[in-house]
């Protein structure tokens, strides 16, 4: 649905009577400002400025073909006499290429300029290489081999065909060849050659004896491949579409004129019906654009010459442009530009020497949701807001008297610009379905009647903009229209104001709402200028807005919501032909094929994806896949719809989530909750967004929300979809800024469902008759099924049919068995029967049970019901109300369900029975090894002996002594029985306290202190009693000091040994280069990988995981761990075992700071012992040496690769995987995450200054 928009028409001065045009590309791929024109058998070099270099490069008679050879930087010229020469365009020097003694009729080079085809005057086809070596030569009238000729298999005989109005007699008539011209001398005898775009085949059109005009297809080796099927009245022009699917040839029929399209095999495929008669307006030239998008047809009539430009879409040919030229200055030739980036540039040379350069670009003419397509004299309009009408159909067709070249649609106005430079204006297009008024015809004034207007654009209700280029500059024209004073009833348009800009303007953009300024871009340097309309209606160039590195083919000024850049609330969007998209010069994307602006989003497409960019911060917020090659036609903001056209021409309408959310948000901002929910339901948007969009607004306007929703079912749907999640920060975060979201003070996201349901429930309870269904749904979401049933049961008393409907709704939300149980839990048998009857339950299942319950006392009935519903606490409360006769049942029920605390609360007034509960509770606690609590419960239950035993097991010696006293047991004996167990658990100080209080034996007291190495306390006690410290304590303390010193030395040696073994293993592995795992180690046995890693060895496949060991038993797993972390030399995982052992050893060393300090202090207190001070100094020195050795080696043992440090993202994943590092990571995963990091040595002040 694209139209051809004229970007500029540049007028140059060339050479009169031109015959050929040669364009010279630069070596870097750009366009040179020098081109060559062949005129009057001379070659001229012409500059873009229009100055003609009068030096004749070559002068040959009867030039029949010419080509600029890029690789040789030479011009190849063929003459009718048979000469083929090469001309140097710089010096004019010539060299002979080849010579044909019989003369040359036509010459054509292949597109890649590797092969050249000639047709001689004797109708021989000669194929040569670029160095003029003959590849093949054969007569033009040679026949195909028998195996390549067309075969008639007898299908479709004339006798069996339907002949319509001619009747059956037509079947008996013999086929006449009268349609073929017998005298081929009457035909144009020119021979035409055309190559396919890939250079593999070429076609030769000529006049054959007995057949008339026909053509043949040859390959690049000169072999005849196909001949055309018999076709009458073919014309002499022939051109092969560069993409290669069609060969175009004009063809005349009695009732129509066409461009016949043949396939490579010579069979007629389809046709393009021309809007004129070839007899009156014959085709002079056929030319395809280099990209095969546009077919140019040049015709010549008596009064004028025309150029028709056709495009194809969805198998329909659209006539997009018609150029009209007077016979007073006829056309000489057409030539499509073949240079890169200029595929839609057409060069038109006139006999007078004028050179017109037309530059078109494809663009979609859209006015909001209305899109128009030009097709000859018809304008096809479709409003995509109302319907998706696939092309070539449309909702409405406007017909005009002449061909349409451009049209403008803005608001309710429509301007149509025709090929005869008239403008038709219709100012009242409201809807396309209504009858349109007859448009006003605006005639051009004398100045505009001879100008080629480009970039025709709407500017204001009474003005249009256009451009006209000449002599290297461009005039910006402000067009106005008025009534003709001389001829009442006639209107004309004229130039109201103009301003000239240096360079060629190829794009114009007008701000949608600021109608006093617009922007233009020049193709020469990529400058974009801001032009304003002054109060006196004159145009003025204000400034250079932005400088692009390369000029764009499409620019668009867009309004940016809530953003001001440099004082302007807008931005310039530009799209280059190389598919680069920019906003104010900032690159947004590349490989962009189309774009449009919808609300606050820039939507653009790439080959198979669509992206959405927020205009205010230029942030890409979303993307989605589309069909390959699809392009944007238009977007309908009010329906969040984007219309795409696929490569084959059909349309696809989608509603992207980003646009739908934008529309829903706008509706919510305006309080249109009904429409917001309707749009969300239609587009499958989660209804949580209704609340999450603006929580504070929703809470404050909950009444308006309920009043605006007409459908109770929609409220039910809203409530049922609620989740404890903020969708503006999760699923729909693309449309929201998390920093701007605010909540009420009493709101929490993790309690969102309860919060919203409570909020709505309070409002809906005021109008229960209107919100019955949503109220029931809210109770279900809150888990208050009983309240939902009460609402239904209340309606049952007034309207049974309505209650049935409400119950059916509830049964849709809740399982029938759960609902039956809830009804049973209300103890209302009427409600139970009502639910049971509607739930399709078998009466044989519930009626006997209900009858049995009715026969029971009320409290015991409630107990049975609660027990059935597994509401054990409530059941026990009802059982407690039944009295003393149910004590035994209650005690058994408490034991069965573990309701000890509840039972104690319910039977608080039953003192004696409560003691039974205490004892039962104590038995339970003792069974689960909670002996301290069991002792307390036994005491409350009056069983002091059991309380004493339980306290003894926990070594709660203070409580044991208290209970022993209550039981009148000897305290000294009880205390002596506790000393040994306390010492076994390392509680030496508590054992000493018992001995000191209940045993008067001083030796026994000191023995307890010395066995616990509590030397400082022993010295303290000895000092208080004036005992001899050196006699009682010194020997033991000195012996312990010597032992501790030996232990520290052993710890140091063990640490150094482990460290050295680890370093040796790492050094050997680094030298071998085989990683950490030997080739004979089977990783299938390694099942201790950490849960924190997801890595697996390449050997550790899915099969090996299924067949490997599982170690379900904890005993087996511990056994396997011991085997895996064995420190035995030669273990495949010895390095892992050493790291594990070192971590444990360092942790143990760090914990010895306090014992070493205390021991040294005690030794210092032995002033009379000669060996005490040296031993204390040695202890401190040994321990300091040990700590220094450990601290210095930590970083050497726990290396960065062992710690990880983000290596996963660097080389363990992605396309470039370091498999050696991956293998190491798998081994390190065997360690617990804690042991992969070095131990933290928390140092205390353990040293004594006097021992330094």
Swiss-Prot record:
Spell out the residue ranges making up region: Disordered.
Answer: 1097-1116
Q: Which residues carry this modification: Phosphoserine?
A: 1094
UniProt GO cellular component terms:
cytoplasm; cytosol; elongator holoenzyme complex; microtubule; nucleus; spindle
> Known Pfam families for this protein?
A-sol_ELP1, Beta-prop_ELP1_1st, Beta-prop_ELP1_2nd, HB_ELP1, TPR_ELP1
Q: Where is this region: Required for binding to tRNA?
A: 1111-1129
Q: Which InterPro entries does the record match to this protein?
A: A-sol_ELP1, Elp1, ELP1_b-prop_2, ELP1_N_b-prop_1, HB_ELP1, TPR_ELP1, WD40/YVTN_repeat-like_dom_sf
Q: Which locations, inside or outside the cell, does it occupy?
A: Cytoplasm; Nucleus; Cytoplasm, Cytoskeleton, Spindle
Bias regions of kind Basic residues — which residues?
1106-1116
What are the entry keywords?
A: Cytoplasm, Cytoskeleton, Microtubule, Nucleus, Phosphoprotein, tRNA processing
This protein's pathway reads: tRNA modification; 5-methoxycarbonylmethyl-2-thiouridine-tRNA biosynthesis
Gene Ontology MF annotations = tRNA binding
Phenotype upon knockout is:
RNAi-mediated knockdown is lethal in larval third instar (L3) stage. RNAi-mediated knockdown in sensory organ precursor cells abolishes central spindle asymmetry during asymmetric cell division. RNAi-mediated knockdown in adult mushroom body neurons impairs protein synthesis-dependent long-term memory formation.
Q: Tell me, which GO biological process terms does this entry list?
A: dosage compensation by hyperactivation of X chromosome; establishment of mitotic spindle asymmetry; long-term memory; tRNA wobble base 5-methoxycarbonylmethyl-2-thiouridinylation
- Keyword Phosphoprotein part of the UniProt annotation: yes
Question: Taking the first listed entry, what is the main subcellular location of this protein, grouped into a coarse class?
Answer: cytoplasm
Entry keyword Nucleus: yes
What binding partners and quaternary form does the record give? Homodimer. Component of the elongator complex composed of Elp1, Elp2, Elp3, Elp4, Elp5 and Elp6. The elongator complex associates with and stabilizes microtubules; efficient interaction requires the full complex.
Q: Which family does it belong to?
A: Belongs to the ELP1/IKA1 family.
Please describe what this protein does. Component of the elongator complex, which is required for multiple tRNA modifications, including mcm5U (5-methoxycarbonylmethyl uridine), mcm5s2U (5-methoxycarbonylmethyl-2-thiouridine), and ncm5U (5-carbamoylmethyl uridine). The elongator complex catalyzes formation of carboxymethyluridine in the wobble base at position 34 in tRNAs. ELP1 binds to tRNA, mediating interaction of the elongator complex with tRNA. Binding by the elongator complex stabilizes microtubules and promotes their growth.
What name goes with this protein? Elongator complex protein 1
Species this protein is from: Drosophila melanogaster
Gene it is expressed from: Elp1
């Amino acid at each position: 649905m694209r139209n051809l928009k004229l970007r500029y028409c540049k007028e140059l001065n060339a050479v009169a009577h031109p015959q050929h045009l040669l364009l010279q590309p630069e070596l870097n791929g750009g366009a040179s400002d020098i081109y060559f024109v062949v005129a009057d058998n001379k070659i001229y070099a012409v500059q873009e400025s229009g100055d003609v270099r009068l030096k004749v490069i070559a002068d040959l008679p009867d030039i029949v073909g010419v080509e600029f050879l890029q690789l040789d930087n030479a011009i190849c010229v063929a003459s009718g006499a048979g000469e083929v020469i090469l001309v140097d365009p710089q010096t004019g020097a010539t060299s002979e290429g080849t010579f044909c003694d019989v003369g040359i009729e036509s010459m054509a080079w292949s597109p890649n300029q590797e092969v050249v085809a000639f047709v001689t005057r004797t109708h021989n086809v000669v194929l040569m290489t670029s160095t003029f070596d003959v590849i093949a030569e054969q007569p033009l009238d040679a026949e195909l081999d028998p195996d390549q000729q067309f075969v008639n298999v007898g299908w479709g005989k004339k006798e069996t065909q339907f002949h319509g109005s001619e009747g059956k007699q037509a079947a008996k008539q013999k086929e006449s060849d009268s349609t073929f011209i017998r005298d081929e001398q009457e035909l144009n005898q020119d021979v035409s050659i055309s190559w396919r775009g890939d250079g593999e085949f070429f076609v030769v059109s000529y006049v054959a004896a007995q057949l008339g005009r026909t053509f043949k297809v040859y390959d690049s080796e000169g072999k005849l491949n196909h001949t055309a099927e018999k076709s009458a009245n073919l014309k002499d022009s022939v051109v092969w579409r560069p993409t290669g699917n069609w060969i175009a040839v004009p063809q005349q029929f009695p009732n129509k004129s066409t461009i016949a399209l043949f396939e490579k095999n010579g069979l007629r495929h389809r046709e393009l019906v021309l809007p004129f008669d070839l007899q009156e307006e014959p085709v002079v030239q056929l030319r395809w654009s280099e990209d095969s998008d546009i077919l140019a047809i040049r015709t010549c009539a008596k009064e004028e010459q025309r150029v028709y430009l056709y495009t194809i879409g969805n198998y329909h040919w659209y006539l997009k442009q018609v150029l009209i030229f007077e016979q007073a200055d006829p056309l000489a030739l057409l030539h499509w530009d073949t240079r890169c980036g200029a595929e839609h540039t057409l060069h038109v040379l006139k006999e007078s020497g004028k050179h017109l350069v037309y530059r078109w670009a494809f663009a979609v003419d859209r006015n909001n949701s209305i899109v128009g397509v030009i097709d000859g004299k018809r304008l096809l309009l479709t409003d995509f807001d109302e319907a998706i009408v696939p092309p070539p159909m449309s909702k409405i067709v406007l017909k005009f008297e002449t061909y349409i070249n451009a049209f403008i649609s803005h608001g309710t106005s429509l301007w149509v610009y025709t090929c005869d430079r008239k403008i038709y204006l219709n100012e009242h297009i409201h809807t396309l379905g209504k009858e349109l008024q007859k448009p006003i015809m605006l005639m051009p004034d004398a100045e505009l009647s001879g100008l080629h207007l480009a970039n025709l654009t709407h500017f204001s209700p009474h003005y249009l903009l256009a451009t006209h280029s000449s002599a290297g500059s461009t005039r910006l024209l402000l067009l106005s229209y008025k009534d003709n004073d001389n001829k009442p009833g006639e209107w004309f348009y004229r130039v109201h104001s103009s301003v000239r800009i240096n360079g060629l303007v190829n794009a114009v953009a007008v701000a949608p709402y600021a109608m006093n300024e617009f922007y233009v871009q020049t193709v020469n340097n990529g400058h974009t200028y801001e032009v304003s309309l002054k109060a006196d209606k004159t145009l003025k160039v204000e400034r250079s807005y932005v400088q692009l590195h390369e000029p764009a083919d499409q620019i668009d000024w867009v309004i940016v919501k809530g953003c001001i850049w440099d004082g302007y609330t807008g931005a310039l969007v530009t799209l280059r032909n190389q598919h680069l998209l920019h906003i104010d010069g900032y690159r947004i994307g590349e490989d962009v094929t189309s774009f449009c602006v919808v609300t606050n989003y820039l939507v653009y497409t790439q080959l198979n994806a669509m992206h959405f960019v927020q205009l205010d911060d230029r942030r890409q917020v979303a993307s989605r896949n589309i069909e390959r090659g699809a392009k944007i036609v238009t977007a309908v903001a009010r329906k969040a719809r984007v219309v795409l056209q696929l490569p084959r021409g059909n349309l696809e309408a989608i509603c992207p989530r980003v646009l739908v959310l934008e529309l829903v948000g706008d509706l919510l901002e305006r309080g249109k909750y009904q429409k917001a929910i309707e749009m969300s339901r239609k587009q499958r948007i989660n209804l949580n967004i209704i609340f999450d969009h603006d929580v504070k607004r929703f809470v404050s306007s909950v009444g308006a929300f309920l009043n605006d929703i007409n459908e109770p079912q929609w409220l039910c749907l809203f409530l049922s979809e609620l989740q404890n999640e903020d969708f503006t920060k999760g699923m729909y975060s693309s449309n929201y800024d998390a920093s701007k979201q605010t909540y009420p003070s009493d709101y929490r996201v993790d309690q969102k469902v309860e919060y919203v349901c409570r909020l709505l429930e309070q409002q809906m309870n005021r109008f229960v008759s209107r919100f019955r269904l949503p109220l029931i749904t809210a109770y279900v979401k809150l888990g208050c099924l009983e309240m939902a049933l009460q609402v239904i049961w209340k309606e049952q008393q007034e309207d049974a049919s309505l209650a049935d409907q409400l119950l059916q709704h509830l049964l849709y939300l809740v399982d029938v068995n759960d609902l039956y149980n809830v009804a049973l839990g209300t103890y209302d048998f009427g409600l139970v029967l009502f639910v049971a009857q509607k739930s399709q339950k078998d009466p044989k299942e519930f009626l006997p049970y209900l009858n049995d319950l009715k026969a029971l006392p009320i409290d015991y009935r409630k107990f049975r019901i609660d027990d059935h519903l597994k509401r054990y606490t409530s059941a026990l409360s009802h059982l407690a109300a039944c009295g003393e006769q149910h004590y035994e049942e209650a005690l058994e029920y408490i034991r069965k369900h573990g309701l000890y605390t509840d039972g104690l609360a319910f039977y608080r007034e039953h003192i004696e029975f409560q003691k039974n509960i205490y004892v039962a509770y104590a038995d339970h606690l003792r069974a689960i090894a909670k002996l301290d609590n069991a002792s307390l419960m036994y005491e409350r239950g009056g069983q002091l002996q059991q309380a004493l035993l339980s306290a003894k097991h926990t070594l709660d010696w203070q409580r044991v002594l208290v209970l022993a006293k209550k039981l009148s047991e000897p305290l000294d004996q009880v205390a002596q029985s506790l000393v040994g167990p306390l010492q076994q658990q390392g509680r030496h100080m508590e054992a000493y306290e018992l001995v000191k209080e209940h045993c008067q034996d001083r030796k026994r007291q000191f023995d307890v202190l010395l066995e616990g190495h509590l030397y400082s306390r022993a010295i303290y006690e000895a000092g208080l009693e004036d005992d001899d410290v050196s006699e009682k304590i010194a020997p033991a303390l000195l012996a312990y000091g010597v032992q501790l010193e030996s232990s520290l030395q052993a710890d140091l040696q063990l640490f150094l040994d482990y460290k050295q073994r680890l370093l040796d293993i790492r050094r050997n592995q680094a030298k071998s280069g085989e990683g950490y795992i030997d080739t004979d180690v089977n990783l299938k046995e390694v099942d201790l990988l950490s849960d924190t890693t997801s890595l697996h060895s390449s050997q550790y496949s899915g099969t090996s995981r299924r067949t490997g060991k599982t170690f379900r038993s904890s005993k087996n797993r511990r056994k396997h761990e011991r085997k895996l972390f064995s420190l035995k030399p030669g273990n495949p995982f010895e390095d892992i075992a050493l790291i594990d052992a070192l971590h444990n050893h360092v942790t143990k060393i760090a914990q010895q700071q306090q014992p070493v300090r205390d021991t040294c202090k005690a030794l210092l207190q032995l002033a009379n012992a000669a060996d005490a001070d040296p031993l204390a100094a040695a202890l401190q020195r040994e321990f300091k040496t040990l700590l220094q050795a450990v601290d210095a080696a930590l970083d050497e043992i726990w290396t960065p690769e062992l710690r990880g440090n983000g290596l996963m993202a660097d080389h363990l994943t992605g396309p470039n995987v370091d498999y050696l590092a991956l293998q190491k990571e798998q081994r390190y995963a065997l360690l617990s995450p804690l042991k992969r990091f070095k131990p933290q040595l928390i140092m205390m002040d353990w040293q004594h200054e006097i021992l330094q």
